Curated annotation (Swiss-Prot):
pH dependence: Optimum pH is 7.5.
Glycoprotein found in the keyword field: yes
Enzyme nomenclature, EC number: 4.-.-.-
Subunit-structure text: Homotetramer.
Signal peptide residues on this chain, from the entry's feature table: 1-18
Keywords associated with the record: Glycoprotein, Lyase, Signal
Sugar-modified residues: N33, N127
Pathway named in the protein's UniProt entry: Secondary metabolite biosynthesis
Function: Hydroalkoxylation enzyme; part of the gene cluster that mediates the biosynthesis of phenalenones such as herqueinone, compounds that have been reported to treat tumors, bacterial infections and/or mycoses, and rheumatic diseases. The non-reducing polyketide synthase phnA synthesizes the heptaketide backbone and cyclizes it into the angular, hemiketal-containing naphtho-gamma-pyrone prephenalenone. The product template (PT) domain of phnA catalyzes only the C4-C9 aldol condensation, which is unprecedented among known PT domains.
Listed GO MF terms: lyase activity
Stated name of the protein: Hydroalkoxylation enzyme phnH
Amino acid sequence: MKFTYLVSLAAFAVTALGSRPTPPNLEFLFSANLTKGPAYIYDQSDAQIKALQTLTGGIIAGPNFDGTVIGGTALSTRGADGTIRADAHYLIQTSDGANILVTESAAIPYVAVLFDTSSEKYNWLNNVTAWGTPPNLNEINFLEYWQIE
């Protein structure tokens, strides 16, 4: 029985190593032009700087919905090597009145995005994993978001 298990495990490993995962496709979701308030540094050392920043507004535009950013917060950490990690939560209100909570986790300039809404019309977003990035690194308040398929 042990031998059969080992043979099965070896066969699985050979099959897995011989196949290549399929890269995901990206479908454009929306662009966001975010407005931010002042950043408040709440922890600073030689190793890092941590800050809290409010998201005070913004415009959302895309092929499936558009709206405004009602508000939110972003926590960021800048390491001594210049890397920036950030986590943000903000609320979008669509032009037809639906509310969508956006949760972001970023290693700047790349952003992983999840959505949460109780709207029947936009319920499909609850199953979307998205990726965002600024098209121009000099304009990090403007981001484009892509659905990972």
